[in-house]
């Protein structure tokens, strides 16, 4: 599947917010906070149209989870046909992706790194290797680091950094002694820290 592999700070500057795409070890806040989108001279901003504002919200969410338009649209279509609030269900579906859960548990410092771990078959789900980043987890599922990868300095460093920067969301439980974690509940809106207005995205796709 095609993926964006270019500079992630450029993406975050375009969206105007930190989308947690880059490790805090290397994140350059001076570059991020330069005025204006990348490649454009500083000038007074014009008024953003309603469509423009809706598009920016969609791009923020899509890029935060590393998705292309076709895949993101499938998540929206599924959410729109489910029972409940469409925007919140959309976020829930995205949070339940395996790459996101590996990131949320602190085994990877970005979702992009989590996808790499999964693609290289370093992640187990319920004791079986899974190499699909979009694999959807359910309540009761157990995520583990493959035995041979547990000694990697990546994992120990990532756990240490994650514990210092962010906690584990309450819908997950981590067992760092055994390099694993469990999905104990479905994520709710207040568990998700992304600065996105999901209802605006629903309005965009509803046109």
Curated annotation (Swiss-Prot):
Pfam families noted in UniProt: Ribosomal_S4 (PF00163), S4 (PF01479)
InterPro entries: Ribosomal_uS4 (IPR022801), Ribosomal_uS4_bac-type (IPR005709), Ribosomal_uS4_CS (IPR018079), Ribosomal_uS4_N (IPR001912), S4_RNA-bd (IPR002942), S4_RNA-bd_sf (IPR036986)
GO molecular function: rRNA binding; structural constituent of ribosome
Keyword match Ribosomal protein: yes
SUPFAM superfamilies associated with the record: Alpha-L RNA-binding motif
Entry annotated with the keyword Ribosomal protein: yes
Gene Ontology terms: biological process: ribosomal small subunit biogenesis; translation
GO cellular-component term (any): small ribosomal subunit
Entry keyword set: Ribonucleoprotein, Ribosomal protein, RNA-binding, rRNA-binding
Residue ranges occupied by any S4 RNA-binding domain in the UniProt entry: 96-156
Superkingdom: Bacteria
Family stated for the protein in its record: Belongs to the universal ribosomal protein uS4 family.
Function: One of the primary rRNA binding proteins, it binds directly to 16S rRNA where it nucleates assembly of the body of the 30S subunit. With S5 and S12 plays an important role in translational accuracy.
Complexes and interactors: Part of the 30S ribosomal subunit. Contacts protein S5. The interaction surface between S4 and S5 is involved in control of translational fidelity.
Name of this chain's protein: Small ribosomal subunit protein uS4
Native source species: Leptospira interrogans serogroup Icterohaemorrhagiae serovar Lai (strain 56601)
Upper lineage: Bacteria, Pseudomonadati, Spirochaetota, Spirochaetia, Leptospirales
